[in-house]
Amino acid sequence: MIRDEIPISAQVLQWRCVESRVDSARLHYSRFAISPFRSGQASTVGIAMRRALLGEVEGTCITCAEFKRVTHEYSTILGIQESVHDVLINLGEIVLRSDSYETQKAFISILGPKKVTAQDIILPPSVKIIDTTQYIATVTKAIHLDIELKIEKDFGYRIEDPIKSADGNFPVDAVFMPIRNVNYSVHSFENGNETQEILFLEIWTNGSVTPKEALYEASRSLINLFIPFLHAEKKEFIYGLKNTYESNMSYFSSPSLSADIDEMTKGVTFKHIFIDQLELPARAYNCLKRVNAHTISDLLNYSQDDLMKIKNFGKKSVEQVLEALQKRFSINLPKNKLHFH
């Protein structure tokens, strides 16, 4: 018998912050307690949360620097104490916070002699420097130092190939991970005749996000990963899964799957799956957000022609959306508007 509803556990988890402190501008710490778990559950959640915190929380970094009249990363600039390579390393360590997913530009334009710090960076309104005292370079002579910076938001890290540098543009190795460390511990306690567990989660950040914000973002990332499994109780989907492995693979690769999923999406199948799962480039993602297309269900209200009408949403962005929908959900958006009744 197939259940039409997923049973909800009577177990009610509660969490609270038991300790929080700011050790420095670039080191924030909080300790959270979550309970009660049944025996064995706390460790499962702890492992998943640690991985999500370290790998799924986004950060903002300087990813490229343009120097005028400089041809090589290991060049020296007359009147600058550091080599270009050393300046790039210092720029990569600057901690930023941004509310925008668009690629941003920032500038350094100073007259020496002067000690150059993060405070000297001219930023767009959506970007904030966490520690303005971070060191960049020392200008020892009365010369101008002009650097144009590219700022991006992403997750993980990006190690650039120095060969890609050209015309004074030098990539910066970017670490987009605002979480410096995560620890968890599990403690058992007796509740009547039942053994339950409490999970303690310790989070250290670089100050660009608070530990509480990081906990929220990591939790949302995990929820998004598991939402597709919640819809496996759909009868038309479950019946298909009763076939052999080979039949399943044939079914999933066939055009009929698109029609099946289109039927499912007429209801609430994708109502709670956010477009974050499509992993779209920043331009396409932000354009969809601006028109309040927050979920896959919202996006399915658009045809290809509708997407083309969105401001700054070009043909390339449409192709990126179509490719992501097909790859992740085997969905094809119609060319023209379809009306569901």
From Swiss-Prot:
Region (Alpha C-terminal domain (alpha-CTD)): 265-341
Subcellular location: Plastid, Chloroplast
Enzyme nomenclature, EC number: 2.7.7.6
Gene Ontology MF, one: protein dimerization activity
Keywords linked to the UniProt accession: Chloroplast, DNA-directed RNA polymerase, Nucleotidyltransferase, Plastid, Transcription, Transferase
Transmembrane portions of the chain: none
A single GO cellular-component term on record: DNA-directed RNA polymerase complex
Main enzyme class: transferase
Coiled coil: none
InterPro entries: DNA-dir_RNA_pol_insert, DNA-dir_RNA_pol_RpoA/D/Rpb3, DNA-dir_RpoA, RBP11-like, RNAP_asu_C, RNApol_insert_sf
Main location: plastid
GO biological process: DNA-templated transcription
Pfam families referenced in this protein's UniProt entry, alphabetically: RNA_pol_A_bac (PF01000), RNA_pol_A_CTD (PF03118), RNA_pol_L (PF01193)
Region Alpha N-terminal domain (alpha-NTD), annotated ranges: 1-233
Protein family according to the UniProt entry: Belongs to the RNA polymerase alpha chain family.
Record comment regarding domains: The N-terminal domain is essential for RNAP assembly and basal transcription, whereas the C-terminal domain is involved in interaction with transcriptional regulators and with upstream promoter elements.
Subunit structure, as described in the record: In plastids the minimal PEP RNA polymerase catalytic core is composed of four subunits: alpha, beta, beta', and beta''. When a (nuclear-encoded) sigma factor is associated with the core the holoenzyme is formed, which can initiate transcription.
Protein name: DNA-directed RNA polymerase subunit alpha
Organism field: Takakia lepidozioides (Moss)
Gene: rpoA
